[in-house]
Amino acid sequence: MAEDKFEQAKGNIKETVGNATDNKELEKDGKGDKASGKAKEAVENVKEKANDVIDKFKGNKGD
Protein backbone atom coordinates (compact mmCIF):
# COMPACT_ATOMS: atom_id res chain seq x y z
CA MET A 1 0.00 0.00 0.00
CA ALA A 2 2.91 2.35 0.64
CA GLU A 3 3.95 1.94 -2.98
CA ASP A 4 0.51 3.13 -4.08
CA LYS A 5 0.80 6.27 -1.95
CA PHE A 6 4.32 6.85 -3.28
CA GLU A 7 3.07 6.54 -6.86
CA GLN A 8 0.30 9.04 -6.12
CA ALA A 9 2.79 11.48 -4.56
CA LYS A 10 5.19 11.06 -7.47
CA GLY A 11 2.34 11.75 -9.86
CA ASN A 12 1.33 14.83 -7.92
CA ILE A 13 4.88 16.19 -8.11
CA LYS A 14 5.12 15.48 -11.85
CA GLU A 15 1.77 17.10 -12.47
CA THR A 16 2.68 20.19 -10.43
CA VAL A 17 6.08 20.61 -12.09
CA GLY A 18 4.56 20.01 -15.51
CA ASN A 19 1.90 22.61 -14.83
CA ALA A 20 4.44 25.14 -13.48
CA THR A 21 6.77 24.68 -16.46
CA ASP A 22 4.00 24.38 -19.03
CA ASN A 23 5.23 20.87 -19.85
CA LYS A 24 2.00 19.15 -20.88
CA GLU A 25 3.66 15.74 -21.31
CA LEU A 26 5.03 15.76 -17.75
CA GLU A 27 1.68 16.99 -16.45
CA LYS A 28 -0.10 14.17 -18.30
CA ASP A 29 2.36 11.58 -16.95
CA GLY A 30 1.75 12.88 -13.44
CA LYS A 31 -2.00 12.57 -13.80
CA GLY A 32 -1.52 9.02 -15.06
CA ASP A 33 0.71 8.09 -12.13
CA LYS A 34 -1.80 9.53 -9.66
CA ALA A 35 -4.68 7.65 -11.27
CA SER A 36 -2.69 4.42 -11.35
CA GLY A 37 -1.75 4.75 -7.69
CA LYS A 38 -5.35 5.43 -6.69
CA ALA A 39 -6.60 2.46 -8.72
CA LYS A 40 -4.04 0.13 -7.15
CA GLU A 41 -4.97 1.41 -3.71
CA ALA A 42 -8.66 0.78 -4.42
CA VAL A 43 -7.92 -2.78 -5.55
CA GLU A 44 -5.93 -3.41 -2.37
CA ASN A 45 -8.80 -2.07 -0.26
CA VAL A 46 -11.26 -4.39 -2.00
CA LYS A 47 -8.93 -7.34 -1.46
CA GLU A 48 -8.65 -6.51 2.24
CA LYS A 49 -12.44 -6.22 2.61
CA ALA A 50 -12.96 -9.51 0.76
CA ASN A 51 -10.43 -11.25 2.99
CA ASP A 52 -12.16 -9.83 6.08
CA VAL A 53 -15.48 -11.25 4.89
CA ILE A 54 -13.89 -14.62 4.13
CA ASP A 55 -12.24 -14.70 7.55
CA LYS A 56 -15.54 -13.88 9.27
CA PHE A 57 -17.31 -16.57 7.26
CA LYS A 58 -14.69 -19.15 8.17
CA GLY A 59 -14.82 -18.12 11.82
CA ASN A 60 -18.62 -18.43 11.97
CA LYS A 61 -18.81 -21.56 9.84
CA GLY A 62 -18.78 -23.98 12.78
CA ASP A 63 -21.42 -22.10 14.81
From Swiss-Prot:
Residues 22-46 have a biased composition (Basic and acidic residues). InterPro entries: CsbD (IPR008462), YjbJ_sf (IPR036629). Residues 1-46 are annotated as: Disordered. Transmembrane segments: none annotated. It holds the Pfam family CsbD. Belongs to the UPF0337 (CsbD) family. This is UPF0337 protein SERP0494.
